[in-house]
Amino acid sequence: MDKRFIALPLHHKMYHQKSICMFLKNCIYLLCLGIASITTTVKAQPYVSPIGAQVFIEPGQTDEEINTWFKLLSEHQMNCCRIRMFENYMKHPDGTWDFSLFDKAFKAAERYNVKIVGTLFPAAPDNSLGGFKHPYSQAHLQEIAVYIKQVVTHFKTSPALYGWVLMNEPGTGGWVPNDAFANTQKSEWLKTLQPTAYNSKGYPQIVDFTPQQFLLHYNTWYLQWIANEVKKYDPNAYLHVNSHQIFSNIAEYNFPAWRNFLSSLGASAHPSWHYTMFHRNQYATALGANCAIIRSGAGELPFWVTELQGGNNTYSGYKAFCPTKEEITQWLWTSIGNGAEHILFWCLNPRAVGDEAGEWALVDFQNQPTDRLTAASEVAKTLRKINSSQFKPVVANIHILYTRETLWVEKKAQLNDNTNNDYEGRNTGGAMKSAFAMYETLLENGINSQFQCFDEFNWNKASYKGETIILSGQISLPSRYWEPLRNFVRNGGKLIMEGLSAFYDENMFALHHTGFPLQDILGGALKEVKCLPTDFSVNYQNALLPAHLWKGSIYNTQGQIVVQEGNSVLATRHRFMRGETFWFPSLLGLGALRSDKGEALSRLLLAEVEAAVPFQFETYQKGVQMYTMQKGNQYLTILINKRPQATTVSLRCPKGVNPSVVFADKGGSATASTAHLSSEETLVILWK
């Protein structure tokens, strides 16, 4: 502000009224001028749809085709896309760079107000499908650095650029690189390791998980390196990465460490590739669990479903199929209900050559919208209409926890054929399926729960009253978690433990006949485990509770007996300080999942957990799911009916809220206490 209008003539004994009026008038004038300048320079940010798709760019495409795809995105209110930035399509053999193909895509995106997330995709041998996961050599690393410099500096000023995906789908499926470059990195990493005080009571450690620990480090190191390279040329760049095969690769992801260099965390969610341990009718629930895992991994960062299957499998996919329009709708609302900021389909258009050629697309071979694209557009329109970004997921204080070491031990233990269905609990994937069963059972009560790595749980709270941890099938419980878990129960938390959870420590050292470290909080230790191939039932509160493979009995020292068969104690409850534990060392999760009868497990869980959520089903609803979101005193409930017939479900709702249907793809309806859905329908209700 001009000092002439502030410095009054203090040497005068008296101020003239006219001078004061002039001073005030000038102040008001300058204030108004400042406000006017602000309102003329600050522009409203353009709306970016939560829903978008991959536009696959490759040589041979015409300008008209490229323009058509971005026009289609805009017309369907899906103005966010992802492009794989192939180095092979930019760099000539003589070392010169030609970005003209991708410039056309960026110009088309600008023309139709579509934002682009560019996936960095440097050159490497055999690199057409998912991309390589680590550099092959120091020379390759330097080539990648040159590629990043070229691409980022060229495109960083484009108005269409939203951000960068650091690499496509990190994660090797547990395979540990053994090339010279990786071994050099491993040698450097080993020098940083500190000796641990815990040594499994001095027993010989004949199982070595150092390779798995290195892979966990190596994935993080490479992502951090890429992020640093991008930031050299674009310090304010938006950085993202998409995990994949979450129910197996989860053991090589250190999400809390990734938060240090990411702007958001994402997931690829292709049922035909990634959900093969589930039946098709469970794909929507599997996506919900996938979202819960990524939401937890992201922490305070946003999370995306970076790739979602959009079209048909011909030769690709482990369990090939073509999603229906109803499934597309279910998957979108499942992602939104879990809080996904963006959902991008793979793909809008099919690639023309190589792996997946002619597959996966939302458009047909004449570039016309399929019913899947139309369905996605209807969801996008609704999301904009209700301003969905203002609603946040309501998630119960129920934490289904997993350990990476469980997956390492499970894989190490595979000595024989692991495809025999009678032994599913000990096959690869058994642990995560058992944990998934807990998630599914709660969801079929309308309760959305947390699905988290032990490292992502907040172990530093003074009180855990009202919170529940579920350990289902987590066979390895590392020593570093024993005291935090004890503190959780001590300070008011509820621990539910089933199956052979805590059977081993991190070194595959059996804990129960060598002095069980959690005997104080559980009130006992395992007495024996009997292998009963296939399935069996246990009588629990005058009803049969399905279980699978392992029947554990408890050496009970302090617990209250809950289930007993003859002299065998099968389940106990124990008060420890301000908290409580409930222990049932048989595979209940897999028992419910395999039998397709979750009602008995549902009764057990609802009796043991505190689910302080505003909306629930009045009774267990097999095959029906509900997610709840909240904005102030308004709620969204998202219901999905996977039953083969129409259904009416009774709802437990807050007092004083009234329903209005904002989305129903098959004419569903709602009253103040019920919802009616056709088979395969998604129904979204606004309550206020």
Task: Give the positions of each predicted feature.
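Short, acidic/polar
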Residues: 60-73, 144-151, 247-258, 324-332, ...
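Hydrophobic targeting/anchoring helices
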Residues: 240-243, 248-436, 528-530, 540, ...
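N-terminal carbohydrate-binding accessory modules
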Residues: 42-80, 389
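A conserved amphipathic helix/loop scaffold
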Residues: 472-688
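The substrate-binding groove and active-site-proximal loops of carbohydrate-active enzymes
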Residues: 51-61, 86-99, 129-143, 170, ...
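Polysaccharide-binding and catalytic clefts of secreted carbohydrate-active enzymes
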Residues: 135, 146-150, 154-289, 293
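A short, well-structured beta->alpha microelement
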Residues: 440-461
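Aromatic-lined substrate-binding rim segments of carbohydrate-active enzymes
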Residues: 66-139, 143, 217-233
